[in-house]
């Protein structure tokens, strides 16, 4: 018995989550949203639902319950051919069966009431809601059908029968067997909901956590033009937005990262000229593809809805939304518990490639694992049976129909799709790495060749030539010994920040800008500033990279700010020390346009780099771009845990000049402090030249502390080129001369009451050096992420000086 026993049809506003047994997870959740969150400003289109009781009585009235049970009991669901035959037979039985007169009458009455409330010209979506769907331990992602832009009661009645039939889709039957659900225990509720005119605007899916790492403090929004089915199906590569929950709550500009998708097609309402089709797919104009389909204001509003919904449900949520192109408002269309990352254990497996080879294809990484095997190229769904255990499935796009064979694959690679499409959801649930939205994977990868599919390197997934060796380490949460020194982390790639932030740490001792400039921008800053007065080839390259941004200059600042903000948000509120760019001239030359602007130096390691660049008139305008990005991260985004570090300061005069230059760009020491004095900007200097340690007291007059760069300090103390294999054996940070300078720098900072940390490679490679540094009284040790836990444990019991 349920509280709605005896009812065949119920309006959404009468439903709550306790009604899952009556109307399934999807429809119960719509009722919960309407009845409980409308006052919080969350808008949900109205509608009604048929009940599980109505579905079961429909089957009984047509003697379908026993017939269906008999054929399913005899079915081997692993036999794809038999599965397709039996599924088609059952669906035909259901579609051809008449609805009981009482059920039809109640649907007609509910439809008339809803139509009167919505007004003329409104159409409806008819969607499925299984009684075992969207529960925290199962995802029935897209297994039953949805029908869009359905108008008129006769069409609604017909689509409800088709929705009932979709409980017996091949993928749904297979999934129930795989998850251990008895077929007769699952019933179907049909939801009839007013359509939002997102065909005239945009729509998408959002999660209240990062889908790959499980990081909880962001909302991930995907968006594309038109109806949301193209995203859910994986037919488009959507735009992506990350919104930081703590800064959203603080009223700051909380969008920390955006990624422009290709958005090649969109689904829109079809008109009468298209016959019986209610929707159609059309190409998106090139100008629209080149811009984001959602404003920052709308992305922030969606994130606020997401936070309210998550707070109400008390768990991470998977939410579908639509922007109405007529009234300009945002609507929530569905909300269900996230079913993969929120269920994972506290033991973390980390995959790392031990080598690399030629990259054959790239796309969006799903999961964080590595898979390898022979490519199985499948152009047509009818050929999916060719996929054998251990194959790498490569196809244009997968939908949930492929689920019976997806679980055989060692990895999945597609041309189309984003991180919230059905294929991505199923791949995560099965624990299979997938690279989606490659664009050209089916052309770049030949059937039968051996490849390695890596999702372990951040947001970008790579398909490598050949079978590469992979290292898998497993860490479990557990207590770490208290230390007198903070253990921090070196982070270069913002795409890995959400994952790294979940390793025990006390902040970031070194966040490098070089990775952001190299990988997220790729263009020399002078080429950006000289645009459009550059040669045709360079202009084309800059135009292509800066699509979706107001200008190439805005693109550069946006991308630096987003990269830094992603790291700062991941570790909030712990300190994140960001080192300003320290490219050498040979490294700047490798950027697009770099050879036009950079000198060819004999020894760039000792050349035009660090603070010398910043204060040079030749580079001043380029440095201004970095400063603008840093100011945005702290002032507009509110991430005042960002501290700035100046590298390679040769003289005390240079130190004074660079601090004055930063102040002129709005980055003065102590600026941006809160009313209580907290959050003021700290400026840290890299102590990496012998002169820095020898004249430490003089340098410290201009900075709030030192971060020791042991790599450069060692090579400059011992006269070694650290890039030369000929003298590599002599490179050792534990050399007495180096340790004397380390001790000198640490003691000077302690005497001045200022911060002193180390961010070089030494402590990661040599735990004995880390222990010695603690004994000297160093404030923090910043380690590579893969050495943090082991080094921390090994240092238990080491004492600092009193």
Where are these regions (language model features)?
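Conserved alpha/beta-domain cores
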Residues: 111, 119, 123-125, 130-140, ...
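Conserved metal-phosphate-binding beta-hairpin within the catalytic cores
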Residues: 142, 314-339
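Conserved catalytic alpha/beta cores of large enzymes that bind or transform nucleotide phosphates
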Residues: 218-318, 323-324, 361-368, 389, ...
């Amino acid at each position: 018995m349920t509280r709605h026993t005896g009812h065949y049809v119920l309006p959404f506003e009468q439903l709550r989550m306790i009604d899952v047994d009556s109307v399934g997870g999807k429809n119960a959740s719509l009722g919960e949203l309407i009845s409980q969150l409308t006052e919080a400003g969350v808008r949900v289109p109205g509608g009604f639902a048929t009940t599980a009781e109505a579905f079961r009585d429909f089957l009984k009235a047509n003697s379908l319950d026993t017939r269906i049970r008999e054929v399913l009991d005899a079915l081997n669901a692993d036999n794809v051919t038999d599965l397709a035959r039996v599924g088609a037979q059952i669906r035909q039985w259901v579609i051809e069966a008449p609805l009981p007169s009482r059920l039809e009458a109640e649907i007609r009455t509910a439809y008339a009431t809803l139509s009167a409330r919505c007004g003329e010209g409104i159409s409806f979506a008819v969607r499925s809601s299984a009684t075992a769907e969207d529960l925290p331990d199962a995802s029935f992602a897209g297994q039953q059908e949805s029908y869009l832009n359905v108008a008129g009661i006769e069409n609604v009645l017909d689509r409800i029968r088709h929705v009932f039939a979709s409980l017996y889709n091949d993928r749904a039957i297979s999934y129930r067997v795989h998850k251990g659900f008895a077929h007769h225990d699952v019933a179907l509720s049909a939801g009839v909901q007013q359509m939002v005119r997102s065909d005239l605007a945009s729509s998408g899916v959002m999660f209240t956590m990062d889908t790959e790492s499980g990081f909880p403090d962001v909302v991930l929004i995907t968006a594309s033009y038109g109806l949301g089915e193209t995203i859910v199906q994986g037919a488009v590569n959507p735009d992506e937005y990350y919104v930081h929950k703590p800064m959203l709550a603080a009223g700051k500009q909380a969008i920390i990262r955006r990624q422009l998708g290709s958005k090649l097609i969109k689904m829109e309402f079809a008109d009468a000229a298209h016959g019986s089709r209610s929707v159609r797919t059309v190409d998106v104009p090139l100008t629209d593809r080149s811009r984001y389909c959602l404003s920052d204001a709308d992305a922030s509003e969606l994130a606020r809805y997401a936070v309210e919904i998550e707070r109400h449900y008390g768990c991470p949520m998977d939410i579908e939304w639509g922007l109405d192109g007529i009234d300009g408002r945002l609507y929530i269309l569905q909300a269900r518990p996230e079913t993969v990352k929120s269920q994972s254990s506290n033991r973390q497996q980390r995959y790392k490639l031990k080598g690399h080879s030629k990259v054959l294809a790239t796309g969006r990484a799903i999961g964080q694992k590595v898979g390898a095997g022979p490519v199985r190229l499948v152009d047509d769904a009818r050929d999916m049976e060719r996929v054998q255990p251990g194959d790498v499935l490569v196809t244009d796009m997968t939908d949930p129909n492929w689920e019976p064979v997806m679980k055989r694959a060692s990895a999945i690679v597609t041309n189309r799709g984003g991180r919230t499409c059905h294929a991505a959801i199923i791949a995560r649930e099965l624990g299979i790495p997938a690279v989606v939205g490659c664009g050209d994977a089916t052309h770049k990868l030949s059937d039968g060749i051996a490849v390695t599919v890596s999702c372990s390197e951040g947001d970008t997934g790579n398909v490598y030539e050949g079978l590469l060796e992979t290292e898998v380490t497993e860490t479990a949460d557990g207590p770490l010994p208290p230390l007198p020194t903070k253990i921090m982390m070196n982070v270069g790639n913002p795409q890995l920040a959400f994952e790294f932030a979940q390793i025990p740490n006390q902040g970031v001792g070194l966040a490098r800008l070089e990775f952001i400039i190299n990988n997220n921008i790729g263009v020399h800053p002078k080429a950006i500033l000289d645009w459009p007065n550059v040669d045709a080839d360079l202009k084309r390259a800059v135009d292509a990279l800066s699509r979706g941004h107001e200008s190439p200059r805005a693109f550069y600042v946006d991308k630096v700010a987003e990269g830094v903000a992603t790291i700062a948000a991941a570790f909030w509120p712990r300190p994140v020390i960001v080192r300003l760019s320290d490219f050498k001239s040979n490294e700047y030359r490798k950027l697009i346009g770099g050879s036009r602007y950079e000198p060819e130096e004999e020894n760039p390691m000792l050349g035009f780099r660090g603070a010398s660049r910043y204060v040079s008139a030749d580079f001043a305008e380029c440095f201004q771009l970095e400063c603008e990005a840093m100011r945005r991260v702290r002032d507009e985004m509110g991430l005042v845990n960002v501290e700035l570090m100046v590298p390679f300061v040769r003289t005390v005069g240079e130190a004074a000049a660079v601090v004055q230059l930063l102040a002129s760009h709005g980055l003065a020491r102590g600026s941006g402090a809160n009313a209580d004095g907290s959050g003021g900007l700290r400026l840290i200097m890299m102590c990496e030249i012998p002169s820095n340690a020898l004249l430490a007291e003089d340098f410290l007059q201009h900075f709030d502390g030192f971060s020791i760069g042991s790599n450069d300090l060692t090579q400059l103390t011992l006269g070694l080129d650290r890039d030369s294999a000929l003298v590599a054996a002599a490179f050792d940070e534990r050399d007495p001369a180096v340790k004397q300078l380390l001790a000198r720098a640490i003691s000077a900072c302690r005497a001045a009451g200022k911060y002193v940390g180390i961010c070089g490679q030494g402590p990661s490679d040599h735990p004995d050096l880390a222990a010695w540094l603690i004994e000297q009284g160093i404030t923090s040790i910043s380690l590579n992420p893969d050495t943090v836990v082991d080094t921390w444990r090994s240092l238990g019991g080491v004492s600092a000086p009193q």
